[in-house]
Amino acid sequence: MKRHLGTCLWVLCLASTAFSSLAVTTSPKPTLASAFSGKSKTTAGTTAVKANKTTVELLPMVINTWKFTAANVLAWRILKQSKGGLRQTRNAVVEGCSKCEKLQCDRTVGYGGSPDELGETTLDAMVMDGATMDVGAVAGLRRIKDAIKVARHVLEHTQHTMLVGDAASAFANAMGFESESLITPESKDMWLQWTAENCQPNFWKNVHPDPKVSCGPYKPRPTPLTRWKEDRARNEYEIGRKNHDTIGMIAIDVESNIHAGTSTNGARHKIPGRVGDSPIPGAGAYADNEVGAAVATGDGDVMMRFLPSLLAVEAMRAGKPPAEAAQEGLRRILKYHKDFMGALIAVDRLGNYAAACYGLDEFPFMVSSPAGTDGPTRLETVKCIAGQDKVNVVSL
């Protein structure tokens, strides 16, 4: 089942146990639209959404970023192996993300995608337990395909939160994972084409020779600067589904036990050693059984500075519904980065959920829960408008 949820700055999908109606009044400012189960009716000046008044069973649930259907279906099947998904949320998230790694989802998850400046693919991944607040993560993982499973081993077999680089690979070998090349003919061709085009775009600044026309090697500019003025818009990097894409997944059982996880091969043509938001708790994902969870995707270099997943969960802790929480998680970024691109999913512990996006044409995401009308698994889509930085907040 596919639902298109309108065009606006923020389009939010929310399931709830009981509703009457919602009215969103238009104004000269960009407006917020919300969509619920049920039919909508549009009139001049007002968008009225009739909600489903019946009580809907929302849990258990699996929700993930992007149209990664196979990952969601597998996670849902694993979650349902026990009644109500009890004690299966970790297995569901790890196996769901692992499925995407194996399928090389959009070539932005798993091996054979997003080569760095040297042509190598490295992986980042994280698993977070909302009951214990324990986290296992890996970053810059080399020569190991199973990033999310290595992250699980960090969680279950160490007292650390994150392992990185070659040392993370050595840990993976000790845990029984085999080393193998993450480079494929496709990723090699991608890198060769990039170098043939003078390494454009790249992530360097304030260096010489000019990084906008040269591959380097680079050195710092000799003139010291007190503040660097960026002369390259972030949207020049083509951030979106085919770059900076991450699978972020949340699984919740009927007792509101929550796990969240992420996996990615990072930004295409990144400087070697770069780590994005995906393996950072509070940035790529965050989970707390007392509140809910959130996962993010987009420009990780920017997002990790603001911890949007943590902001969304803390907004729900303060009593805000997922729709407002998702906005709040991204609004902080927009204060400083008007050319930012990204999306955020927020889910409360009861299974109510919302998605917010900015700067992309649209943001699809997958949901599996008993609330589906044509089966448990459905695709939902958010349409976004770039270049806007103000929204009207509607009380839900």
Curated annotation (Swiss-Prot):
It holds the Pfam family Asparaginase_2. Keywords: Autocatalytic cleavage, Disulfide bond, Hydrolase, Protease, Signal. Its EC number is 3.5.1.26. Residues 1-23 form the signal peptide. GO terms for biological process: protein deglycosylation; proteolysis. It comes from Drosophila erecta. Disulfide bonds join C100-C105, C199-C215, C357-C384. Substrate binds at R274, V275, G276, D277, T297, G298, D299, G300. This is Putative N(4)-(beta-N-acetylglucosaminyl)-L-asparaginase GG24090. Heterotetramer of two alpha and two beta chains arranged as a dimer of alpha/beta heterodimers. The active site is at T246.
